[in-house]
Amino acid sequence: MPKDTKPLTTAAQGHDGWDRRSFLKAGGLTVGGLGLASLIAACGAGDGSGPSNSGTLTLRMPFMADMQVPDPDIFYEAEGLQLTNATYEGLAKYQPGTATIVPNLATGWTISPDFLTYTFQLRPGVKFHDGTAVDAEAWQKSFERRKVVEGGPGYMVKGVASTAAPNPTTFVVTLTEPNNAFIHYLACPFKPAAVSPTALSANAIGDDHAQQWLTTHDAGTGPYTIKEFVTGSHYTLEAFPDYWGDKPTFQTVRIEVTPSIANQKLQLDGGGLDLATKGFPVPDILAYKGNPEFTITNTAGGIGDAIYLNQSAGIFADKALRTAVLNGVDRTSIVATAWGGMTTAQPGMFPDKCFPPELAPMPTKIDPQALKTMVAALPSKKLDLACAVDGGAPRQQMAELLQSQLSDAGFDVSLRVMPLAEQFDLTNQPPERRPDMMIAWLGGDTFHLDTTFRIAARTGAAPVNFFQYSNPELDRLMDEAILQPNEALRNEVYRRCTQLVVDDAIWIPLCVPPSTTIAHKNVTGFVSESFIPMTLQLQDLKRT
């Protein structure tokens, strides 16, 4: 008997062999759920007292860098997610602020007991931006396109054996093997989206499935549609008048490519911007918190910051030394100092919404003396510490505080900032050319741990298994986890997976960085995407 649709919590439903082989194939060095770029929203010029009501129909927002192409089957990064989530929608989504899965373009679904067949009841009356109806056959073609395009998020449909459209409002997906993470793929920020077959057919060049056209246009169902997409300059969105849900207040959204946080701050202070969602240093955030003209909201998502240790070469090829670092570093003080009390050190390896921390707690006893003793005996005490650039000022400060602690332990630490291009090329480098230690994000595409383990720790996975960790027992367990019929059994397998990586001391979790929105007090209606909360639901924003 199929199960009735119910909200699914943290670890509902992974996949054997679905590591992201085509992770960066079609769009440059980008990373899902990752990349962590700033988005700023603005409306009109101001006099220092905040944006005026005369500009309520236009919202202006900078990105810190150009985004990847807005094709939903290629796009796979955080920068630009604001745009793609405003133009495309999936069958399901995460309820804001939670790991619970709720309907979106589907009104409900049933899942067979063997996790092989998913039957979706489709929302009636939904239209694509070209005016055509969204029906089950359109969903079949959308799934087919994601599979054949083979972009970064293509792994999400690699395990689909077939789809069916028994009637216009019923869409059936059958998998090749059980996968209790599949419904999370359909709800995450990089989910398979409804793409208009009419637009694809009209704009295809040969067998490119309209990829060229979709570099500057969209074919979705979202509250906004792309009016302009000018690389290196700006992107303009317009409200879709036939949107099935709540109609947007802002008729136009203009996104400027603005790399400088200092420039963004000047515009925010002068009233030229409505809000900022990420990238400001903690002292600035705290200053805005004390300013009655602004409101501050902090939201935690599903990706944490962590210390990576290079177990493949150099001084940390010694497991005992890695363990001494894990037990000797004061994570609590690093996080508290760098973040000014805005977040705390993670109690477990993964964010709370991904896995209950009490099932696999991190050690709480700190033993710096044991680390000092081991370092004193090392023939070379040089340590290359890299800090991934996309974490902004707080991550940089955490790296500096870590450098200080390691220096006190006797290491000769060199700290450097690592560009994203270098970070995502690490798997192509010999082990000895990788840094000894790195601070970067740690997470997957969903709140389900399968995507984290499979992309960051699976044998041979690239490019996010940065130091090419390999543990056959972990590979076996992550394959076992996705077959479990309920959350309790699945969590027990993931507890064992987590214990393996803790015992091997390859990762040391730091914190879940808060996504901070700084807004003029007359801007309201903030609803964030749950997994990557710097992405706002633009249709909910209002100016009072």
Each model region followed by its residue ranges:
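Ligand-site clamp/hinge motif
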Residues: 240-286, 412
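Gly/Pro-rich hinge or "lid" segments in bacterial periplasmic/extracellular proteins
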Residues: 95-96, 190-247, 252
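Structural transition elements
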Residues: 340, 344-377, 392-397
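Long beta-strand-rich cores associated with HINT superfamily self-processing modules
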Residues: 517-544
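N-terminal lobe/hinge region of extracytoplasmic solute-binding protein
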Residues: 61-113, 144, 219-221
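Extracytoplasmic/peripheral linker and loop segments enriched in polar/acidic and small residues
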Residues: 414-424, 451-520, 544
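Surface-exposed binding/hinge segments that line
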Residues: 121, 155-203, 228
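N-terminal secretory signal peptides
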Residues: 1-22, 33-38
